[in-house]
């Protein structure tokens, strides 16, 4: 999705468990993906630092601030601590995005892959340096104010 909708190189931050999926994980590495160990703060910080370097090098990084795929369309889960660090440390804007119907490709009827109409909605870019200190502390408010 990222490579067909974003005009620049992109990567994703994914959970470390994705490394165990043959072929997919190899493709992800080639596509600038980083694997986040959510159970190890030190390793997680290393991943974020690598992500900062990728952004500074011109690669847009997709993050999933809720820390998991949200199966509901009606409400956001709380954002994970650190989900804004790439933007904070690089000064790059956050472009909110919603992905709808992606589970219909594979997840809802595994192992079959089904052609599906996936909807991508982009919100207004958010510049953290233009937010109040309170808004930066409560990153969930970003969805309420600027969500896709």
Name each model-derived stretch.
Residues 13, 19, 36, 42-44, ...:
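Soluble extracytoplasmic domains of inner/organellar membrane proteins
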Residues 14-15, 32, 64-66, 122:
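A secondary-structure boundary/capping signal
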Residues 1-41:
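Catalytic core of membrane glycerolipid acyltransferases/transacylases, capturing the structured
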Residues 22-26, 56-62, 71-135:
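A cross-family acyltransferase "interaction/gating" segment
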Residues 135-148:
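Membrane-interfacial terminal anchoring regions of lipid-handling membrane enzymes
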Residues 4-5, 86-89, 146:
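Alpha-helical structural signal in soluble globular domains
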């Amino acid at each position: 999705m990222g490579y067909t909708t974003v005009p620049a190189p992109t990567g994703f931050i994914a959970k470390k468990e994705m490394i165990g999926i043959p072929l997919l994980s190899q493709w992800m590495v080639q596509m600038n993906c980083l694997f986040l160990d959510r159970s190890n703060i030190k390793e997680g910080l290393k991943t974020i630092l690598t992500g900062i370097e990728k952004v500074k090098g011109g690669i847009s990084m997709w993050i999933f601030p809720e820390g998991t795929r949200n199966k509901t369309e009606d409400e956001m889960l709380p954002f994970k601590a650190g989900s804004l660090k790439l933007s904070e440390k690089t000064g790059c804007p956050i472009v909110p995005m919603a992905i709808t119907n992606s589970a219909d490709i594979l997840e809802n009827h595994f192992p079959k892959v089904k052609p599906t109409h996936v909807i991508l909605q982009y919100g207004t870019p958010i510049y953290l340096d233009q937010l109040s200190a309170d808004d930066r502390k409560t990153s969930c408010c970003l969805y309420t104010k600027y969500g896709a």
